[in-house]
């Protein structure tokens, strides 16, 4: 079995797969290293043969997690590293090491699945878009605040905006103009995300016409499904690229 980890700024997404055929044994999202070890340890018949990690954390934080994983499960984690070129994709950043590893691996995974030009829209803490040409050239992308950041900024800097997560969820049953603060904030943020997605689609069409594949990934991908009905929703797109960057079989 292989433990795969996607370590973001706020959460760790994890899954355990069979080494032979990549069948998913279990998975989840946690908010701390300790919670990760506890959750993975509850899997029945757990026998890890390896671990691979993609991380946007600092080197020190990533190293600490690798040590913890090694102590808990007796495996040596492999951490994905930036590359100028891999699996037919050429990193488009002027300094290739500065491209976030989550974006790089999502680009690898998307190009592998699309076998041609593709647009990746990743909606998590940040909203990100990346363009990969039919020849594998990464053309660059965009980053802006995602739903969690927009929401937290409004809550933090506007004293009268206070509501809980349950209220936020109820507010998203419609996108009609809000008749309460929670509805106005939540629906406004969703419309901004949808506008972001539509703009990326326009950009992609200006580059490739209709000859491209759209991928939606990240926890808030369902919120923009309406804006990109032709998109393929691939929640584990980063893990597709991670397996390519860190083969363990």
Curated annotation (Swiss-Prot):
Biological or metabolic pathway of the protein: Cofactor biosynthesis; coenzyme A biosynthesis; CoA from (R)-pantothenate: step 1/5
Principal location: cytoplasm
Q: Required cofactors, per record?
A: NH4(+); K(+)
Q: What does the record say about how the cofactor binds?
A: A monovalent cation. Ammonium or potassium.
GO terms for cellular component: cytoplasm
Q: Which GO terms describe its molecular function?
A: ATP binding; metal ion binding; pantothenate kinase activity
Q: Which of this chain's residues are annotated to bind ATP?
A: 6-13, 125
- Catalytic residues in the record: 102 (proton acceptor)
Describe the reaction catalysed, as an equation: (R)-pantothenate + ATP = (R)-4'-phosphopantothenate + ADP + H(+)
Q: Which CDD domains match?
A: ASKHA_NBD_PanK-III
Query: What SUPFAM superfamilies does this protein's entry cite?
Result: Actin-like ATPase domain
Whether Transferase counts among this entry's keywords is yes
Q: Does the keyword Acetylation apply?
A: no
Residues engaged in binding substrate:
93, 100-103, 181
Keywords associated with the record: ATP-binding, Coenzyme A biosynthesis, Cytoplasm, Kinase, Metal-binding, Nucleotide-binding, Potassium, Transferase
Instruction: Write out the GO biological process terms.
Output: coenzyme A biosynthetic process
Catalytic activity, EC: 2.7.1.33
Family listed: Belongs to the type III pantothenate kinase family.
Cite the record's note on assembly.
Answer: Homodimer.
Instruction: Supply the name of the protein.
Output: Type III pantothenate kinase
Q: Which organism is it from?
A: Pseudomonas putida (strain W619)
């Amino acid at each position: 079995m292989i433990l795969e980890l996607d370590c973001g700024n706020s959460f760790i997404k994890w899954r355990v797969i069979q080494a032979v055929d990549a069948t998913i044994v279990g998975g989840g999202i946690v908010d701390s290293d300790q919670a990760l070890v506890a959750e993975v340890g509850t899997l029945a018949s757990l026998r890890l043969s390896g671990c691979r990690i993609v991380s946007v954390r600092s080197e020190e934080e990533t190293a600490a997690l690798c040590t913890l994983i090694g102590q808990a499960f007796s495996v040596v984690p492999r951490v994905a590293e930036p590359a100028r070129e891999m699996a037919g994709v050429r990193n488009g950043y002027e300094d290739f090491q500065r491209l976030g590893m989550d974006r790089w691996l999502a680009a690898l995974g998307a190009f592998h699945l699309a076998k041609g030009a593709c647009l990746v829209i990743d909606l998590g803490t940040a909203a990100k878009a990346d363009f990969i040409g039919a020849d594998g050239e990464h053309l660059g992308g965009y980053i802006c605040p995602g739903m969690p950041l927009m929401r937290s900024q409004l809550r933090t800097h506007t004293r009268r905006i206070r509501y809980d997560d349950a209220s936020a969820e109820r507010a998203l049953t419609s996108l009609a103009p809000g008749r309460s603060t929670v509805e106005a904030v939540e629906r406004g943020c969703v419309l901004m995300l949808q506008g972001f997605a539509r703009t990326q689609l326009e950009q992609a069409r200006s580059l490739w016409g209709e000859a491209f594949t759209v991928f939606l990934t990240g926890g808030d991908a369902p919120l923009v499904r309406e804006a990109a009905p032709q998109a393929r929703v691939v929640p584990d797109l980063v893990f597709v690229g991670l397996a390519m960057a860190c083969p363990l079989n």
